[in-house]
Amino acid sequence: MRVTAQLIDATTGYHLWSERYDRPLKDIFALQDEIVQKIVATLKLQLTLWEQGDLVRKRTNNLEAYDYFLRGSEQFLRLTKETHAQARQMFERAVELDPQYAEAYQALGYTYLREWMFQWSPTLQNLERAFELEQQALVLDPSLPFAHVLLGWVHLWKDRQYEQAIAEAERAIALDSNNADSYMALAEILTYLGRSEEAIGWMEKAMRLNPRYPALYLRILGTAYYWTGRTEEAITVFERALARNPNWLAAHLFLAFVYSEVGREAEAKAEVAEVLRLSPAFSLEGVRQRLPLKDPADLERFLDGLREAGLK
C-alpha cells in the first residue's frame, strides 16, 4: 500500500507538509495514527491528554470489519430503500467480525432510525432497536459524539423528549466542539421546538466547520428558513439539497410543503411523487405519527400543505 499525504493551508494554497508512505496493508491503522501525529506536530498543536487519546483511538483492529463499515457507509448515503438494506447487512457483518466495534453499532442503529423516519417500516420496534444499539455503542465508547446525536434523535422521534434530545446534542458538542454534526443535530431539534432563529445560527456554524456538508444540512437550514418567514431562501436551499442528492426524501417532503404554501401546485405535486417513488407507503398519517413539531398548529399546517400537494 502506498499513501501520499499532503497538508495544505486552504487560505493560501501553501504546502505545510508532504510525505509518502509505503506499508503492508495490515499496518493501515498504525499508518493512520502516524500521519495524524505528524500533522499535529507540523501544526504545533497543544493537545489535552483527552484529545491525544481521541486521535490515536483505534475504532477496530479488524481490517475486514473496517472494510464492511466503509462499504456500508457508502450504501447508507445513497438514500434508497434498497441501498439502505445493503448498508444494514454490511454494518451487521462488521459487528459480527468485531463485537467491540462501537462505530459499527452506532451506524447500525442509524439504519433502524432512518427506516422509521422514511416510513420504510411501520413498527415502533425500529425505534426501540435504534435506542438499544446507540446505547451499546456508548457502552463500548462513551466518547462517540454522533452516538449521542442519534440517541437524542431517538428521544425526539420516539417520545417527544425535547429536553433530553437537546441534552444529548449538547453532550456531543462537549465531547468534540469541532464536530459539525453535533451542531447540525442541535439545530434540527430547535426547529421542531419553534426556535428556528437559534437553529440558523447553529447550522451556519456547522457549515463553517464542515464546508463539504451533506444534503441533510441544507434540508435543516431550509426548514429553519421557512419557519422564520424566509420562504424563498428556503426553496432555494431545498433545491440545492436535492441537486446534491436527488434521493433525499425529507428534502422532497419539505419542498412539497413549501411549494404548496406559495401556490406552486404542480411543483408541489411533483415533489410528492418523488416522495412516493422513494417510499411508496408514505402517508399523511405516518407524518402525523413521526414529525416531532412541538406546536400542534405547526403540525396541522404542515399536514394541510402536504394534503393540498396530493399526499394521502
What are these regions (language model features)?
Residues A281-K312:
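Terminal, low-structured helical/coil segments at or just beyond the last alpha-helical repeat
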